[in-house]
Regions:
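Alpha/beta-hydrolase fold nucleophile elbow
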Residues: 158-169
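The feature captures the conserved acid-bearing segment of alpha/beta-hydrolase catalytic domains
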Residues: 195-281
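N-terminal cap/lid segment of alpha/beta-hydrolase-fold proteins
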Residues: 24-74
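Alpha/beta-hydrolase active-site loop
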Residues: 130-156, 179
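Short beta-strand element of the alpha/beta-hydrolase
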Residues: 74-86
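Cap/lid segment of the alpha/beta-hydrolase catalytic domain
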Residues: 87-94, 113-138, 183, 298-299
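C-terminal catalytic histidine-bearing segment of alpha/beta-hydrolase fold enzymes
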Residues: 268, 272-338
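Short amphipathic alpha-helix adjacent to the substrate-entry channel of hydrolases
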Residues: 93-112
């Protein structure tokens, strides 16, 4: 839904009870107003930040999309979806259509702004300033973490079922979802030691809310992860659905360097590399690889249909997995319509 407001429906739920009910029955004539939940725009979740040039960022905000017909007497699972932009640009409005589509499948969806910017130069020629690039990735992880903490702390206010938080994104957004899901401060001190010392905690930036959320699943449309060693079921190995083209010029098929440039170390894990690590840990994982496709790969409708199906099966306790090519239908409930 795209009408950003929160309105009272011109309807009232009237509870009428038959005579002869139990002694604990509520009296007849009790009226309980129902609110229709409408999309909310520019909900602030982080404050007092600094961008890559040292300029002050007063706040970051999110947009919240509700399923059509969602009402205030119910809670709904949430998908937090990160926009693309190569860590140099983009904003939450770029994924409004994707959020609308996921909302149509019964999820509250959240799109949020995160800090972007680094000295890009020409990544294809291996001349990107990697220090500023890794800073940009780390800031985005901080901002994603702040968004998730805010959602966990304020779920009731927004009718979010905070027991069912899913995380996803496309391109840079997929990398944010993967990396921030698998990175807490203990991990950051090992894999992002320079950025941690320079930019601070990955889980305390932007707001003072505690990190109490639990991610129940990840959707990554052509994204990467900083290491496969962090996928460990003793700690975290999230149910995941992956999409990627097998001729992606920026990401490796399994493990390798950004744009194939060794000076962009450390190596990244993508596609088959993430899939293999999750299979090894016996975590539910679906991997779609499109032959001949670069970046991006699959169309949005196919991705949203299968993401929604995968997450719903995780919720029902019937997750599925497998590796597929082309547009192979795999959703157990999908037969033309979901």
């Amino acid at each position: 839904m795209r009408n950003f407001s929160f309105v009272l429906l011109p309807l009232v739920l009237s509870l009428s009870f038959l005579q002869g009910g139990s002694s604990g029955s509520k009296p007849t004539g009790v009226n309980m107003p129902l609110f229709e939940l409408r999309d909310l725009k520019d909900v602030e979740f982080a404050w007092n930040l600094t961008d890559w040039k040292g300029n002050k960022v007063d706040s970051l905000s999110m947009d919240i999309y509700y399923p059509t017909g969602a009402t205030s007497n119910k809670k709904y699972p949430v998908v937090v979806f990160c926009h693309a932009g190569g860590f140099t640009g983009g904003n939450k409005s770029n994924v409004s259509s994707l959020c609308d589509e996921l909302a149509d499948y019964g999820f509250i969806t959240v799109a949020f702004d995160y800090r972007t910017g680094y000295i890009k130069n020409n990544p294809h020629a291996c001349t990107t300033d990697t220090a500023t690039l890794f800073n940009a990735v780390y800031r985005a992880m901080q901002d994603g973490n702040a968004c998730l903490r805010f959602i966990q702390a304020n779920g009731k206010k927004y009718n979010i079922d905070a027991d069912w938080i899913f995380y996803g994104g496309s391109s840079a957004g997929a990398s944010i979802a993967l990396n921030s899901a698998y990175c807490n401060d203990s991990i950051a001190k090992i894999y992002f030691s320079r950025e941690y010392k320079l930019l601070g905690s990955v889980e305390k930036s932007g707001n003072t809310l505690p990190r109490n959320y639990a991610i129940k699943g990840i959707a990554a449309m052509w994204g990467s992860l900083f290491s496969d060693k962090v996928i460990d079921k003793k700690f975290r190995a999230y149910p995941t659905i992956l999409f990627k083209g097998d001729e992606d010029s920026g990401l490796p098929d399994s493990v390798g360097y950004f744009f194939g440039c060794p000076n962009y170390a450390p190596p990244l894990y993508a596609g088959a590399g993430i899939y293999a690590a999750l299979v090894k840990q016996k975590a539910p994982v679906v991997y779609y690889e499109l032959p001949g496709a670069n970046h991006p790969a699959y169309d949005d409708d196919f991705c949203m249909q299968n993401i929604a199906c995968f997450f719903k099966n995780v919720m029902s306790g019937t997750p599925y997995g497998g590796r597929y090519t082309y547009y192979t239908p795999t959703c157990p409930q999908f037969d033309g319509e979901f």
